[in-house]
Each structure stands twice: as C-alpha cells, then as structure tokens.
A protein has these predicted regions:
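Short active-site oxyanion
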Residues: 45-48, 149-150
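A charged, well-structured terminal subsegment
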Residues: 107-110, 154-173
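Generic N-terminal amphipathic, Lys/Arg-enriched alpha-helix
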Residues: 12-28, 39, 43-44
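Short acidic/histidine- and often glycine-rich active-site loop of Leloir-type glycosyltransferases
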Residues: 143-146
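Active-site nucleophile and cofactor-binding loops and adjacent substrate-binding regions
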Residues: 49-53
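Acidic/glycine-enriched connector segments
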Residues: 11, 32, 39, 54-129, ...
Length: 173
C-alpha cells in the first residue's frame, strides 16, 4: 500500500485508533498513569480518541501532546472551547453521554482507566460490539456473584499500551 491509501475507517494503513475512557475526577495516581499511557500510545503512532474533557481525558491528551502525537476529543456539548487544552482535535457532538457510542465505534481497541458509570457504560458497549478492552485500575465484572474474565487488566501504563496496541493490531475493519 502506498502512504495515502486508507483501510476501512482506521485512517492511514497501520495507524491504530485507541480509545481511552476514564474518570473525570480521578485520584492523582490515575492522572499520572493516564499521562504515561498517552505518551506511550503516541510514541507507538496511535491516534488517541477520548471524551475530550477533564481528569483522565486531560491527562492522556497531555501525554499524547508531550510525545507529539494526535488526540481526538469527542465532546459532549456544542462548543470546541469545552475541550481540554491538550486536545489535538476537538469535535463537539452535542450528544451528551451518547458520545460514548461514538468513542467506542471510532476505536480499534479501548483502554479503561479508573472511571465511574460512564466508563462502565463504555466498557460494556465495547464488549457488546466486539471492540477489545484493556483495563487499568478500572471496573471488574461479575455475573451472579462470579467473576467474568471479559478483558485483560494491566498493572501499569506500559503494559496497558502494549496490550491495547496488540489488540488493535488484530482488528480488521
């Protein structure tokens, strides 16, 4: 393939689109982990897609920017100005939490970093539609009191980046 050819919706051939979901008000440790994760993903050439807001989203975009990478924020409201200052591309959707569907569908694989119910909804949707998920200090799932081994869980951002990039590489769309 030449440099300008497109493959499906992933953009230039071989460029993974990695979604990052996470808490808007995380504890400081998660902020540090998310920033390192963003840096690692950008260093690997991934486009990082997130909700574009505060907390984990700001931290991951800060890491992406520090490494000279590309981040895309799918904002819940109607204003580009509501995005965090590290976003490469701010896309206002006007969809509120409905943007979670866009985040999952735009991603070849997803990393969940900490998070609340919004992150849980993104994990569930990704699993439902077959988008690979990697967890980093996030939700664990149970069904009828039994653990569900639905996705791998990383111990640190380097492992999370490796796992999600491996998963994204296996996706054919």
């Amino acid at each position: 393939m030449s440099g300008g050819e497109q493959t499906g919706r992933t953009g230039p051939a071989g460029v993974p689109y990695v979604g990052v979901a996470g808490a808007s008000r995380p504890e400081p440790e998660l902020v540090e982990l998310a920033e390192v994760l963003g840096r690692r993903l950008a260093e690997a050439g991934a486009v990082v897609v997130c909700g574009g807001g505060s907390g984990v989203m700001t931290a991951v975009c800060k890491g992406v920017a520090a490494a000279g990478g590309t981040s895309v924020g799918l904002l819940p409201g109607d204003s580009r100005a509501s995005g965090n200052p590290y976003l490469g591309v701010a896309l206002p959707t006007g969809l509120g939490e409905g943007r979670n569907v866009l985040l999952v569908r735009a991603s070849d694989a997803l990393v969940a970093v900490g998070g609340g119910f919004g992150t849980l909804s993104e994990i569930a949707l990704a699993l439902r539609v077959g988008v690979p998920v990697v967890g980093l200090r996030t939700w664990s799932l149970e069904l009828a009191g039994r653990p569900v081994d639905a996705f791998p869980v990383a111990d640190d951002p380097d492992e999370a980046a490796r796992l999600v990039l491996e998963a994204a590489a296996r996706v054919t769309r």
